[in-house]
A protein has these predicted regions:
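Extracellular/luminal regions of secreted and cell-surface proteins that mediate adhesion/ECM remodeling
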Residues: 19-282
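Positively charged n-region of N-terminal signal peptides that target proteins for export
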Residues: 1-4
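Bacterial N-terminal signal peptides
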Residues: 7-16
């Protein structure tokens, strides 16, 4: 009888093993990118100051800003990929030709703008009023290693080219956009559009002195307009341009105090930085 029981158990073993292996494989989630906003980087890199914005700056043209001296809040944004797979976008020339909704063309600096990549908001702590930043476009590349990444530290950067379309006299420049695992795409405070206009020079209401949140959302949700592509849908039915394993960790914010008269030297961690005479583009 014991032999029969043992034989029966051995007969069922392959089936049980197969079921166990199947369950094990089925429970492993697919490798996916996961974008966050580096709150520490934001906290350490902002300044409120008076600054001259000439008409030649593309951010002035694209943001509808009146040229001249303005009170600005400049800041740095870093968006690391802490997921298990690279965020691959590829060549914007191909996406633009396919009209898939990922990119639009900015004529000011012969540059593609990735749509719905990040949302910059300045929020009044007292009233909840929201102001938008001057930033209008983004190019995703591996700018710097994210030191807090919990995974392997020896992964390489793979995405280094924004790309540009052809002109009447110049050929197209192939791009290769994306963010490698453990790397971050970073937009430093000096770049075009990395600021809020505080004095109403961009057509928005004046930002009065007081306490505010700088709120950054990477890969923000949006409602697709009629005919607009919706590449990825979250659990709330909202669209996202990029696929991620987790859409719930895409927002970060810091609280700051905006003074009445910041002056040219400014107030904040980046005070006393030289005034800008040119506007680097990303």
């Amino acid at each position: 009888m014991k032999r029969l029981a043992l034989l029966a158990a051995l007969t069922l073993l392959p089936t049980a093993l197969a079921v166990t292996l199947y369950k094990s494989k089925a429970s492993v989630p697919p490798a996916m990118p996961d974008l966050i906003v580096d709150q520490k980087r934001l906290l350490q890199n902002w300044v409120v100051r008076d600054e001259k914005l000439p008409a030649s700056f593309c951010s002035v043209e694209e943001g509808g800003i009146t040229p001249g001296e303005h009170a600005l809040l400049r800041f740095t944004v870093s968006t690391p990929n802490i997921g298990t797979a690279d965020l691959f976008v590829g060549d914007p020339n191909v996406h633009f030709a396919n009209n898939d909704g990922l990119f639009e063309y900015a004529t000011c600096h012969r540059h593609f703008h990735f749509r719905h990549y990040a949302l910059y908001e300045l929020v009044s702590v007292d009233t909840g009023t929201v102001w938008r930043a001057a930033k209008r476009g983004f190019c995703m590349i591996d700018v710097e290693k994210y030191q807090a990444y919990p995974g392997p530290s020896n992964n390489d950067r793979n995405y280094l080219a924004c790309g540009a379309p052809a002109t009447a006299t110049e050929p197209a420049i192939p791009g290769n956009q994306g963010i490698s695992v453990g790397w971050a795409d970073t937009y430093v405070w000096k770049l075009g559009g990395q600021y809020f206009v505080l004095d109403g020079g961009d057509g928005q209401p004046v930002v009065p002195p007081g306490d505010y949140l700088i709120r950054i959302t990477v890969n923000p949700p949006f409602v697709a307009l009629n005919g607009e592509p919706c590449p990825n849908v979250d659990s709330h039915g909202l669209c996202h341009q990029l696929p991620e394993s987790n859409y719930d960790n895409n927002v970060s914010f810091i609280q700051i105090t905006i003074p009445d008269h910041p002056g040219k030297q400014g107030v904040g961690p980046l005070k006393n930085q030289p005034q800008l005479t040119a506007e680097p583009i990303d």
